[in-house]
């Protein structure tokens, strides 16, 4: 099968944008609409902007880009509806990808990945290609590549999370993924679905006790200002599923696809490096900004038994054969 890198490059042919540039790729300019819910600096916005800029450079006057961010056109769920109907051409999708294709539930299996090299090996290989094929069939979307939201950590105001027992009764904000909610219920927490923009105030007012996200989001949204504990769990790795409307993709010329292909690969690499840099730098930024926040490691062995049970339940949702193949690829 094609590697995800090749898939990403091929798919980028569908992602042109509406800002005039220099360097023609085709006689007729390609018009594209790009949008993201998040604000500048967030991982999904960073990836979409990197794609926009790379495509401009590649296509010049051959592309016109209409670009929106900061939720101008709605939240991620609305964006998914718009890209499927053709109102948008290219968007990044975070945890909500599972709402379009149950195979994406595998990403909610705890401790599936241990490092970024392992992630790249799986997503840039046959399993990434399988997810692309499934997304085309089930959602009408072409995956151009997989970027990074990152490894998620737990923050809260109740106690340090060291073992699953420490999660008991903790009101934890999660994304809308049913499998993420199920996972934390099985771990003993009380997960609450909530829009990310509401989290700070909800923590401040005690509506929720905490949340789980990579350092990039913790720092960007300043949640450390209203949290006492950050537990370095790295319990789940969340990719960015970078997609284009399939009909739009299929309408591209070979030259346009090649340009999109190159720009998407640039965006994938930029996104992954951005995530790695955030992990390397932002813990220290948070420590200096919020010296009263307590950091701790978890006892990962104590989570493993429950993680196996969660994996078995998620396998029923994602498909047992597919889940087995994915787990095998992740443990090579």
Which ranges hold each PLM region?
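Bacterial N-terminal signal peptides that target proteins for export
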Residues: 1-11
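N-terminal secretory/targeting leader peptides
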Residues: 10-12, 28-118, 127, 136-332
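Sec/Tat signal peptide C-region and signal peptidase I cleavage site
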Residues: 21-27
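Short, solvent-exposed secondary-structure boundary motifs
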Residues: 17, 131-136
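Signature of the catalytic double-stranded beta-helix
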Residues: 122-132
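Bacterial N-terminal signal peptides
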Residues: 10-20
């Amino acid at each position: 099968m094609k590697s995800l890198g090749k898939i990403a490059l091929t798919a980028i042919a569908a992602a042109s944008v509406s800002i005039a540039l220099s360097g023609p790729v085709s006689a007729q300019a390609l018009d594209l609409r790009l949008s993201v819910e998040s604000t500048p600096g967030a991982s999904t916005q960073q990836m979409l902007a990197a794609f926009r800029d790379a495509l401009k450079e590649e296509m010049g006057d051959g592309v016109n880009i209409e670009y929106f961010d900061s939720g101008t056109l709605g939240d991620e769920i609305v964006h998914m509806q718009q890209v499927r109907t053709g109102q948008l051409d290219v968007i990044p999708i975070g945890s909500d990808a599972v709402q379009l294709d149950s195979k994406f539930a595998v990403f909610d299996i705890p401790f599936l990945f241990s490092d970024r090299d392992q992630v790249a090996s799986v997503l840039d290989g046959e399993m990434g290609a399988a997810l692309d094929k499934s997304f085309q069939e089930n959602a009408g979307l072409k995956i151009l590549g997989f970027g990074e939201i990152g490894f998620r950590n737990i923050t809260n105001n109740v106690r340090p999370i060291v073992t699953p027992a420490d999660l008991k009764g903790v009101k934890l904000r999660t994304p809308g993924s049913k499998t993420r909610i199920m996972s934390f219920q099985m771990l003993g927490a009380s997960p609450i679905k909530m829009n990310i923009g509401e989290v700070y105030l909800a923590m401040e007012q005690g509506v929720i006790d905490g949340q789980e996200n990579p350092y990039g989001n913790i720092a960007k949204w300043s949640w450390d200002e209203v949290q006492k504990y950050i537990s370095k769990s790295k319990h789940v790795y969340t990719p960015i599923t970078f997609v284009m409307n399939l009909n739009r993709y299929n309408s591209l010329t070979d030259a346009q696809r090649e340009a999109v292909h190159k720009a998407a690969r640039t965006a994938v690499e930029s996104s992954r490096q951005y995530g790695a840099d955030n992990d390397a730098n932002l813990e220290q930024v948070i420590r200096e900004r919020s010296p009263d926040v307590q950091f701790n490691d978890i006892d990962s062995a104590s989570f493993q038994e429950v993680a196996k049970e969660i994996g078995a339940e998620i396998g029923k949702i994602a498909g047992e054969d597919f889940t087995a193949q994915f787990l095998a690829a992740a443990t090579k």
